[in-house]
Structure formats: structure tokens, C-alpha cells
Amino acid sequence: MISLVLVLLFSGRVEAVTNWSVDKRFKDNGDKTITDTKTGLMWMKEDSYLHSGHWVNWFESIQFVKKMNEDGFADQYDWQIPSVEQLTTLYEADKINSKVLGRGMNIHIDSIFSKEGGASLWSIEENGYHNAFGVIFNTGKRFNSSKKSRFRKSFRAVRYSN
């Protein structure tokens, strides 16, 4: 790997080095996004907590994605809050990314994603007027919570890759 980088440096060519997960399922695009080659989805590398430094409720996650699209995060304008089904594709019980920020529980997501952050991620799916669903990444189970709750919750935006 080092010789490849040195050859590229001394040859005058500049090329981005693509970083892949160990199992080659996930590709780090080098622009704060990760592409899942199994599902065709592109994800934020960081969850919203790592990106902004604060926990969010469901309503704030909607506004956060709206701002991402206005700003063209990673030169894309079609980011969305994922469904429960999309979120569960990231959960892999045999993989440990890191510990939940401030807790002793493991986050079961590929280590190509940014470390720490939140384990409870919002989905776009509502449960009545006051609640919404999400996925807990230390168990892989769906949760149901008040849309106003910020307690240790974040989200990870998604889009369909080109």
C-alpha cells in the first residue's frame, strides 16, 4: 500500500485511494459518505450526533436532512431519513464498531462508519401522531418513542447511490 501511494506521488498522478470494509461490502467514498454495495444505499459516515455534537428529536432530524439537501451535502440533494427496513440492513450482530457514547454497550455496525455516537437512530416511520420508530444498534431491535424525545437519539441520513 505504501509503495502504491509513493508511486502515485512520484509519478505526478493524484488519485483517491478508496477505502473498503474488510468484507468489501461498504466503500468509503472519501466525502463523508459510505456506499453499501449490497443494498445500493449511500449513508452518512457519521451519525447526526457526531456531525453536530448534539442529540436530536424526530422533528429536528427532519429539519437536519432538509438543511443537508439545501447545502448539497457530499454534492447530493436527495438525502432522506431512512426507513426501519433500511436501518436494519446496517445492523450486523457479528460486527462491533465501538461502544455507545457514554455507555458500555456495543454498536453493531461495520467499523468503516465513524466510531461512537448514538446507538438509537430515528427512522422516517411514524407511529400515530406523537411517536416514531427507530432502530437500536446494540440489539438490532426497533424502538418506539415520542417524536419530541432527544434522549440519546440521533439519525444517519441515506440516499440511493447512483
Predicted feature descriptions by range:
Residues 2, 8-80, 84-162:
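Glycine-aromatic-enriched surface loops/turns that form tight recognition elements
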